[in-house]
A protein has these predicted regions:
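Membrane-embedded alpha-helical segments of multi-pass transporters/permeases
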Residues: 9-10, 14
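Acidic surface patches and DE-rich sequence motifs
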Residues: 102-104, 138, 152
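N-terminal sensory and localization modules of signal-transduction and trafficking proteins
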Residues: 19, 23-31, 100, 132-136, ...
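Conserved beta-strands of PAS-like sensory domains
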Residues: 118-119, 140-171
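Short, small-residue-biased leader/transition segments that mark boundaries at the very start
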Residues: 1-8
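Extracytoplasmic/periplasmic sensory segments of membrane signal-transduction proteins
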Residues: 26-132
Length: 171
């Protein structure tokens, strides 16, 4: 006579286990959706910052202008270009580096550098050929990088890459 009781307790246990597993799966799915939404929001912020510099006429004007002497160029870079580009790091602590790499060999602090510095990087070929924002993750170096070709410089005959390195652990 104990057989039906055991069978019903086994059935009840199975149903309870199934209910708890379903609840756990829904909870994990919800947590994952929240995480994805958070990361998407963070990436959107960095994309907007990339757009801000990439399509900034002042930035492209300074980099494409035909200066009469080095001092004039240096003055524009220090007084106007640097503050614009560096402001991204000041307002977003999780940004490690913002650099515009260009093909004219100019180097200034961390904001401006020659393309040759990144020609051997994994992201270079796709970035130099696309004005879309491309994201790259290097798990070994713990780097999260946004890189894209700057169309505003391309129209002036200059190859330029907008590069943002974000703190890997902040995402």
């Amino acid at each position: 006579h104990s057989f039906p009781t055991r069978r019903s307790s086994d059935l009840a246990y199975g149903q309870m286990r199934s209910i708890l597993m379903d609840r756990d799966v829904r909870s994990m799915e919800s947590a994952l959706r929240q995480s994805v939404t958070t990361v998407d929001g963070q990436i959107e912020v960095y994309d907007n910052l990339s757009n801000y510099i990439t399509f900034n006429e002042t930035v492209s004007g300074i980099l494409s202008y035909n200066y009469s002497n080095k001092y004039e160029m240096y003055s524009q870079i220090v007084t106007t270009f640097d503050p614009l580009v560096s402001s991204l790091k000041y307002f977003h602590n999780d940004i490690n580096k913002v650099t515009i790499y260009i093909n004219n060999g100019i180097k200034h602090d961390t904001t401006l550098a020659p393309l040759s510095e990144i020609e051997n990087e994994a992201f270079y070929n796709s970035a130099v050929n696309s004005t879309n924002i491309n994201w790259y993750v290097d798990k070994d170096k713990k780097e999260l990088i946004s890189a894209r070709k700057m169309s505003t410089l391309a129209t002036a005959g200059i190859t330029g890459i907008m590069y943002i390195n974000v703190d890997y652990d902040s995402i």
